[in-house]
């Protein structure tokens, strides 16, 4: 067996690369034709039903507006019902056929069943399920002394997407519908100070990749990954994907290149309606895939030099509307080093990337 593996290790990689190099144009042509066809004849969302979790602000809010422009019927789900009322009114003015708001916590399976059942009872169908809830953090893992929020991070970033999908799938099968997931570039490009978030997003992406195979073509899956997004990053502020405005503080400045939440939401909805398997924004992040595969040491050096250099104080946090989660303590590290979670609201939590 060792001999067989040695032979395969020697011949399979170069043979695969040569085959891919020659077959790449042939593979791209049908994909381009399919993309053009779906752009022209993609899903017409007029009157169709879309459930959006984490809809009270940020990406979830902007996605609601994009579907409203397409005259869809919306079900807006979040914990902050008072925020949903204003967004629902805006969506109606923008063209939504009808808007239902539901206060629910998507990390609880019974509440997911409740809002899906309410959707079916009222509309009789579900065409798209858009999961946007997330919770980001910034801390060095080895400095954490209070681990009580670890399960919360994983519940929100993983189970907060899985439970709604599980409950909605039987109804999505009936309409040949689609599940849209708000993932992140950290799922394949993990960054320092975001260890648990990156792990949860990687698990999420791999879950939906597997689910895509299981569902075949009966229910579509669109995985949207984004890098830094925001509207005020040049002034040191950025809009978290679920809407809480935060201030990035660090003992040295960090320059960030990103894009507006509105643009990501527009691309995400357009890609879902075309039936795209993936939506990436900004697309230039793809270059890091090459480094990840062929030169991983370059990324390691870059992170050490640019993000977490030796000799720099590890004092970084999000400040703004942050508070404890459900009365639970925030993550703390030995003074003066404090690692804070971005604010949690199950209209979604705050998330950085």
From Swiss-Prot:
Give the SUPFAM superfamilies listed for this entry. Answer: NAD(P)-binding Rossmann-fold domains
Q: Which PROSITE patterns match?
A: ADH_SHORT
For membrane topology, the record states: Single-pass type II membrane protein
Binding-site list for substrate = 184
GO cellular component terms listed in the entry, alphabetical order: cytosol; membrane; monolayer-surrounded lipid storage body
Which EC main class describes this enzyme? oxidoreductase
Task: For the motif Proline-knob, give the residue ranges.
Answer: 13-26
Q: What is its main location?
A: other
One GO molecular-function annotation for this sequence?
Answer: 11-beta-hydroxysteroid dehydrogenase (NADP+) activity
How are the domains described in the entry? Answer: The proline-knob motif may be involved in the targeting to oil bodies.
- Report the family membership: Belongs to the short-chain dehydrogenases/reductases (SDR) family.
Q: Which PANTHER family match?
A: DEHYDROGENASE_REDUCTASE SDR FAMILY PROTEIN 7-LIKE (PTHR43391:SF14), RETINOL DEHYDROGENASE-RELATED (PTHR43391)
According to UniProt, the name of this protein is 11-beta-hydroxysteroid dehydrogenase B
Q: Which organism is it from?
A: Arachis hypogaea (Peanut)
């Amino acid at each position: 067996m060792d001999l067989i593996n040695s032979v395969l290790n020697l011949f399979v990689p170069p043979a695969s690369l040569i085959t891919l190099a020659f077959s790449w144009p042939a593979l791209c042509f049908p994909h381009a034709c399919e993309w053009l066809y779906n752009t022209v004849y993609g899903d017409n969302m007029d009157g169709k039903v879309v459930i959006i979790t984490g809809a009270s602000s940020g990406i979830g809010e902007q996605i609601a507006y994009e579907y409203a422009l397409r005259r869809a019927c919306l079900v807006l789900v979040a914990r902050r019902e008072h925020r949903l009322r204003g967004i629902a009114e805006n969506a109606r003015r923008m063209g939504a056929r009808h808007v239902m708001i539901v206060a629910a916590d998507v990390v609880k399976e019974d509440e997911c069943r409740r809002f899906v059942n309410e959707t079916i009872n009222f509309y009789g169908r579900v065409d798209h399920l858009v999961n946007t809830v997330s919770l980001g953090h910034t801390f060095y893992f080895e400095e954490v002394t209070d681990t009580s929020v670890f399960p919360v991070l994983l519940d929100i970033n993983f189970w907060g997407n899985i439970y709604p999908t599980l409950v909605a799938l039987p109804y999505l099968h009936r309409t040949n519908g689609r599940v849209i997931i708000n993932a992140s570039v950290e799922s394949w490009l993990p960054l320092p100070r975001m260890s648990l978030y990156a792990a949860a997003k990687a698990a999420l992406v791999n879950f939906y990749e597997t689910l895509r195979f299981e569902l075949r073509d009966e229910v579509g899956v669109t995985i949207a990954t984004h890098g830094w997004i925001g509207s005020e990053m040049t002034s040191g502020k950025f809009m978290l994907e679920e809407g809480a405005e935060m201030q990035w503080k660090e003992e040295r400045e960090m320059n960030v290149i990103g894009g507006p939440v509105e643009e990501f939401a527009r691309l995400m909805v357009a890609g879902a309606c075309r039936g795209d398997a993936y939506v990436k924004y900004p697309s230039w992040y793809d270059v890091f895939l090459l480094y990840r595969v062929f030169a991983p040491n370059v990324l390691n050096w870059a992170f050490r030099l640019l993000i977490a250099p030796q000799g720099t104080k590890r004092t970084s946090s999000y400040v703004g509307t942050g508070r404890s989660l459900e009365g639970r303590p925030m993550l703390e590290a030995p003074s003066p080093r404090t690692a804070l979670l971005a604010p949690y609201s199950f209209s979604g939590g705050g998330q950085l990337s």
